[in-house]
Amino acid sequence: MIDSDGFRPNVGIILANEAGQVLWARRINQEAWQFPQGGINDRETPEEALYRELNEEVGLEAGDVRILACTRGWLRYRLPQRLVRTHSQPLCIGQKQKWFLLRLMSDEARVRMDITSKPEFDGWRWVSYWYPLGQVVTFKREVYRRALKELAPRLLARD
């Protein structure tokens, strides 16, 4: 599903532990790290997509987490030209994302990257909340900055 402007609707997931650290995942067979994220299917709400992606990419169920906050609007990034599939229709030039801040409520041992036949990640670690800003690929950096900034007050507010 790609909108009329060429952006694919997507959810981004910031999963925090009790210490306020966030889950940082390594893309399979790469040295690229990022937050879990994934597309929103037709007739699927952002929250439904969040739980589906959380399970597919991190192995967690709805009962393992609590939603602390969600960004108010869509945050967009454009793909670098080298990543745009110019022969695909409709043309996708980037992603528009709703970001969710989650608190892990179960044991971290439940995090599993290998429950699907095509895993996206092969490793993960806990990092400080702002660490991803200096590490994520450049074209996603501004969206990360905006999402982290908007959601930070909810992480700092003790539930």
Curated annotation (Swiss-Prot):
It comes from the Bacteria. Keywords: Hydrolase. A motif (Nudix box) lies at residues 38-59. Residues 6-149 form the Nudix hydrolase domain. GO terms for cellular component: cytoplasm. Its EC number is 3.6.1.-. Signal peptide: none annotated. One of its GO terms (biological process) is mRNA catabolic process. GO terms for molecular function: mRNA 5'-diphosphatase activity. It holds the Pfam family NUDIX. InterPro entries: Nudix_hydrolase, NUDIX_hydrolase-like_dom_sf, NUDIX_hydrolase_CS, NUDIX_hydrolase_dom, RppH. Its cofactor is a divalent metal cation. HAMAP family: Nudix_RppH. Accelerates the degradation of transcripts by removing pyrophosphate from the 5'-end of triphosphorylated RNA, leading to a more labile monophosphorylated state that can stimulate subsequent ribonuclease cleavage. Belongs to the Nudix hydrolase family. RppH subfamily. NCBIfam families: PRK00714.1-1 (NF001934), PRK00714.1-4 (NF001937), PRK00714.1-5 (NF001938). This is RNA pyrophosphohydrolase. It comes from Pseudomonas aeruginosa (strain ATCC 15692 / DSM 22644 / CIP 104116 / JCM 14847 / LMG 12228 / 1C / PRS 101 / PAO1). The gene is rppH.
